[in-house]
Amino acid sequence: MKKRLNIGLVGLGCVGSAVAKILQENQEIIKDRAGVGIGIKKAVVRDVKKHKGYPFEISNDLESLIEDEEIDIVVELMGGVEAPYLLAKKTLAKQKAFVTANKAMLAYHRYELEQTAKNTPIGFEASVCGGIPIIKALKDGLSANHILSFKGILNGTSNYILSQMFKNQASFKDALKDAQHLGYAELNPEFDIKGIDAAHKLLILASLAYGIDAKLEEILIEGIEKIEPDDMEFAKEFGYSIKLLGIAKKHPDCIELRVHPSMIKNECMLSKVDGVMNAISVIGDKVGETLYYGAGAGGEPTASAVISDIIEIARKKSSLMLGFETPQKLPLKPKEEIQCAYYARLLVSDEKGVFSQISAILAQNDISLNNVLQKEILHSNKAKILFSTHTTNEKSMLNALKELENLQSVLDTPKMIRLEN
């Protein structure tokens, strides 16, 4: 047996440098748990001059790292989609183990990688929710269960913004600026606030839970950029919080996948998850509900997950990457057939008969009201009507909102949030 496993590290940014630091600082406990010493032999970066003082070779020659016969595991922390995918294929072709934190690459290429890998280990614990061991939970801890559903706060940036809006009555714009100032949001935060990042993670988790090869364009994705303080006020009034959730549900003949802002009851454990923290609730048919909570991003939490994969590979606990021999054939539930309760916000003319018109359209679409708030806008002839419904289907709700928008008394496009009870 080898006395040391050599790592080839691609990328020395926030996570890459944290991997190097932890491997050095915790080398004894890592060796005890892995049963072998683990160290970085070589790292590849774009600009060698920016990375000084490391006790291993640093170059910009990626091919030499792949070809180095002394390197046992390649760890990819470079970002992007196609370049990391090409690196993964070349690494696996050399029968070297591959570890990645790259959720976008896995969202698009996870099944191709599993087919390429054959019996060569691939680790990707760090690709979803950083320091939370949700990948291992689905692959191993819950493997005796049918996963009935899971839902989670999968993006720390959006959760921080919504937490600020809920607790401090901040506008979306101000909460986003605050997140950027603190380093929680990128200068271009589109992937976070539009739900794309959470959707990438949802696809990876759905592959593990259900064995399906779903595509990004097939699932319902909505972001948080249309949420306003009025929505938060309604949520507080009726005992809800608003969170961006990734949701998966198993039906007898299909799988339901969606990412969108959701109103959830304050009794729900996920409603208590604030700031940049992540959490995922998983329901198995035998174990019941389990909850996984922790830091979803950041250098050291993500590096911790990367190193857990390296240790797993060192122990030679290789297994199927996605936990299924072959992709399962269950289709996705059509978006228009989704069933839940809804919240809507309307800007209307402040005049008699408007609410009667709204109620009539909802009734025509078999939608019944649950809670209603009406807010006058001072020094104007306008008002806001905020309401929630009982359970209905997506098609009926969208049809009703379209009809409401066509009313002369409705002054702007109606806004909608789904309720996840």
From Swiss-Prot:
<keyword id="KW-0915">Sodium</keyword>
<feature type="binding site">
    <location>
        <position position="130"/>
    </location>
    <ligand>
        <name>Na(+)</name>
    </ligand>
</feature>
<dbReference type="InterPro" id="IPR002912">
    <property type="entry name" value="ACT_dom"/>
</dbReference>
<dbReference type="Pfam" id="PF01842">
    <property type="entry name" value="ACT"/>
</dbReference>
<feature type="binding site">
    <location>
        <position position="125"/>
    </location>
    <ligand>
        <name>Na(+)</name>
    </ligand>
</feature>
<keyword id="KW-0521">NADP</keyword>
<dbReference type="InterPro" id="IPR001342">
    <property type="entry name" value="HDH_cat"/>
</dbReference>
<keyword id="KW-0560">Oxidoreductase</keyword>
<dbReference type="InterPro" id="IPR016204">
    <property type="entry name" value="HDH"/>
</dbReference>
<keyword id="KW-0486">Methionine biosynthesis</keyword>
<dbReference type="GO" id="GO:0046872">
    <property type="term" value="F:metal ion binding"/>
</dbReference>
<feature type="binding site">
    <location>
        <position position="132"/>
    </location>
    <ligand>
        <name>Na(+)</name>
    </ligand>
</feature>
<dbReference type="InterPro" id="IPR036291">
    <property type="entry name" value="NAD(P)-bd_dom_sf"/>
</dbReference>
<dbReference type="GO" id="GO:0050661">
    <property type="term" value="F:NADP binding"/>
</dbReference>
<feature type="binding site">
    <location>
        <position position="128"/>
    </location>
    <ligand>
        <name>Na(+)</name>
    </ligand>
</feature>
<feature type="binding site">
    <location>
        <position position="186"/>
    </location>
    <ligand>
        <name>L-homoserine</name>
    </ligand>
</feature>
<feature type="binding site">
    <location>
        <position position="46"/>
    </location>
    <ligand>
        <name>NADPH</name>
    </ligand>
</feature>
<keyword id="KW-0791">Threonine biosynthesis</keyword>
<dbReference type="InterPro" id="IPR045865">
    <property type="entry name" value="ACT-like_dom_sf"/>
</dbReference>
<feature type="binding site">
    <location>
        <position position="103"/>
    </location>
    <ligand>
        <name>NADPH</name>
    </ligand>
</feature>
<feature type="binding site">
    <location>
        <position position="197"/>
    </location>
    <ligand>
        <name>L-homoserine</name>
    </ligand>
</feature>
<comment type="pathway">
    <text>Amino-acid biosynthesis; L-methionine biosynthesis via de novo pathway; L-homoserine from L-aspartate: step 3/3.</text>
</comment>
<feature type="binding site">
    <location>
        <position position="183"/>
    </location>
    <ligand>
        <name>NADP(+)</name>
    </ligand>
</feature>
<feature type="binding site">
    <location>
        <position position="15"/>
    </location>
    <ligand>
        <name>NADPH</name>
    </ligand>
</feature>
<dbReference type="GO" id="GO:0009088">
    <property type="term" value="P:threonine biosynthetic process"/>
</dbReference>
<dbReference type="Pfam" id="PF03447">
    <property type="entry name" value="NAD_binding_3"/>
</dbReference>
<dbReference type="InterPro" id="IPR005106">
    <property type="entry name" value="Asp/hSer_DH_NAD-bd"/>
</dbReference>
<feature type="binding site">
    <location>
        <position position="15"/>
    </location>
    <ligand>
        <name>NADP(+)</name>
    </ligand>
</feature>
<feature type="binding site">
    <location>
        <position position="298"/>
    </location>
    <ligand>
        <name>NADPH</name>
    </ligand>
</feature>
<dbReference type="Pfam" id="PF00742">
    <property type="entry name" value="Homoserine_dh"/>
</dbReference>
<comment type="pathway">
    <text>Amino-acid biosynthesis; L-threonine biosynthesis; L-threonine from L-aspartate: step 3/5.</text>
</comment>
<feature type="binding site">
    <location>
        <position position="103"/>
    </location>
    <ligand>
        <name>NADP(+)</name>
    </ligand>
</feature>
<comment type="function">
    <text>Catalyzes the conversion of L-aspartate-beta-semialdehyde (L-Asa) to L-homoserine (L-Hse), the third step in the biosynthesis of threonine and methionine from aspartate.</text>
</comment>
<feature type="binding site">
    <location>
        <position position="186"/>
    </location>
    <ligand>
        <name>NADP(+)</name>
    </ligand>
</feature>
<dbReference type="GO" id="GO:0009086">
    <property type="term" value="P:methionine biosynthetic process"/>
</dbReference>
<feature type="binding site">
    <location>
        <position position="298"/>
    </location>
    <ligand>
        <name>NADP(+)</name>
    </ligand>
</feature>
<feature type="binding site">
    <location>
        <position position="298"/>
    </location>
    <ligand>
        <name>NAD(+)</name>
    </ligand>
</feature>
<keyword id="KW-0520">NAD</keyword>
<dbReference type="GO" id="GO:0070403">
    <property type="term" value="F:NAD+ binding"/>
</dbReference>
<protein>
    <recommendedName>
        <fullName>Homoserine dehydrogenase</fullName>
        <ecNumber>1.1.1.3</ecNumber>
    </recommendedName>
</protein>
<keyword id="KW-0028">Amino-acid biosynthesis</keyword>
<feature type="active site" description="Proton donor">
    <location>
        <position position="201"/>
    </location>
</feature>
